[in-house]
């Protein structure tokens, strides 16, 4: 199926108007249903802004409850509460949530409807096909952050803390304390990837006193991090050989590398686990199927760890969901400008005004979809 960016108002469906009066829409906030997902993509503050702009806001009951936002707060902000996701999909022009669409949602998508959520198309081909088949307009929320995703920052920081929890003896780990104690050495931690996630993890682990090595393929990033931390961290180029060299003395590895789809190699294969001491920890924050860690398989907050070759693996896919209040506030603040641009000006005009928004825009070819409003 062909996918493209719409560049003509004559080929854009619902919400394509170029002024506020024409493009008033019904905004729908779903309750996320992914296992262990407690975040919301819009707090009552964002709902109040959307209503003040002249739009109708529908909120599914319980959408923000696990993140600390009660239904009554959404009502006070001007939202109308509805009971089911079917109510949202059936009435809203613009539908949003945090995580990917679940298969039970595929039949509810409709032509011309605007969907703003994480899609991760490389890992979810069935979801992509459902979007194409429905004729809806989808925006990939995971790509919408100009200055780095607050969820990536949260995943790095909280992932580091989850790794430290996994290191506890009661969880199968070595039982080492991060900064060490009088007469006992600090943990040695290896961070793979020096991007937003890796830097966030580094900030926590360094502050807590771990001895940290960061690996990346970009020597410029490594130089910058060395300067930022006054030469108190180690850096190396990220190669399988360098990783193997460090693993025998490493207590915890954090994988923060976004692995290219279709790559048939690993940074840490199963045989390399034997280089690590019993009770060592791997935290796979990137969480890519067929990714950098061969022994990876996805886990949940309810059952977050497994042990393979004596190494504790923590592989929860939605780590930021564990700090739902903070991540919801940060995430919602980062996406509300996109929401307002689309709601107030329509899809076409919003994309014309902000070329960055075009990068998130996914839909069937214009010739397959006619304007519905």
Show the residue positions of the predicted features.
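Rossmann-like NAD(P)-binding element
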Residues: 88-101, 240-265
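An N-terminal-biased, well-structured beta-alpha scaffold segment characteristic
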Residues: 15, 21-130
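Glycine-rich phosphate/diphosphate-binding loop of Rossmann-like nucleotide-binding domains
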Residues: 37-52, 58-59, 177-250, 255
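Conserved small/polar residues in nucleotide/adenosyl-binding loops
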Residues: 1-8, 361-368
